[in-house]
């Protein structure tokens, strides 16, 4: 009974090198938008586009280097769960905004 918890599933844990690469990429992907916001040398639309692109890339970096999501068989369930969660959140936010805008326009018409 004392050894009931001896079975551990060894997942793909990252190495120090992997974590350092992820950390350095995260710093770079944070510094670029910060620099663009602090010194507005580009047009506003381009700045916003670059900041959004850096945010999306940073999400991917975090998923790969810190959450260890990849295309391996062991991570397949985690990837599908993440994709489903992303879909549900996108639907929740998108449809909520659609409802609020519809209500707003209906209130203006009266």
Curated annotation (Swiss-Prot):
First-listed, main subcellular location of the protein, grouped into a coarse class: membrane
Keywords per UniProt: Cell inner membrane, Cell membrane, Electron transport, Membrane, Oxidoreductase, Transmembrane, Transmembrane helix, Transport
UniProt protein name: Cytochrome bo(3) ubiquinol oxidase subunit 4
Cytoplasmic domain ranges by topology: 1-18, 68-78
Domain of life: Bacteria
Compartments it resides in: Cell inner membrane
UniProt family annotation: Belongs to the cytochrome c oxidase bacterial subunit 4 family.
Membrane-traversing stretches: 19-39, 47-67, 79-99
GO biological process per UniProt: aerobic electron transport chain; electron transport coupled proton transport
InterPro entries per UniProt: Cyt_c_oxidase_su4_prok, Cyt_o_ubiqinol_oxidase_su4, Cytochrome_c_oxidase_bac_sub4
GO cellular component terms, A-Z: cytochrome o ubiquinol oxidase complex; plasma membrane
Entry keyword annotation includes Kinase: no
Coiled-coil regions listed: none
Main function: Cytochrome bo(3) ubiquinol terminal oxidase is the component of the aerobic respiratory chain of E.coli that predominates when cells are grown at high aeration. Has proton pump activity across the membrane in addition to electron transfer, pumping 2 protons/electron.
Oligomeric form and interacting partners: Heterooctamer of two A chains, two B chains, two C chains and two D chains.
A Pfam family annotated for this UniProt entry: COX4_pro
Keyword Transmembrane helix carried by entry: yes
Membrane topology: Multi-pass membrane protein
Membrane topology, Periplasmic segments: 40-46, 100-110
Single GO MF descriptor: cytochrome bo3 ubiquinol oxidase activity
């Amino acid at each position: 009974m004392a050894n009931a918890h001896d079975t551990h599933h060894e997942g793909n844990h990252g190495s120090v090198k992997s974590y350092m690469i992820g950390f350095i990429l995260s710093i770079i992907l944070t510094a670029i938008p910060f620099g663009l916001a602090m010194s507005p040398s580009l047009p506003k639309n381009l700045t916003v586009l670059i900041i959004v692109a850096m945010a999306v890339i940073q999400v991917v970096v975090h998923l790969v280097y810190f959450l260890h999501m990849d295309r391996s068989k062991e991570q397949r369930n985690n990837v599908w769960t993440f994709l489903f969660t992303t879909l549900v959140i996108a639907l929740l936010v998108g449809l909520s905004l659609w409802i609020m805008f519809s209500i707003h326009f209906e209130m203006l018409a009266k």
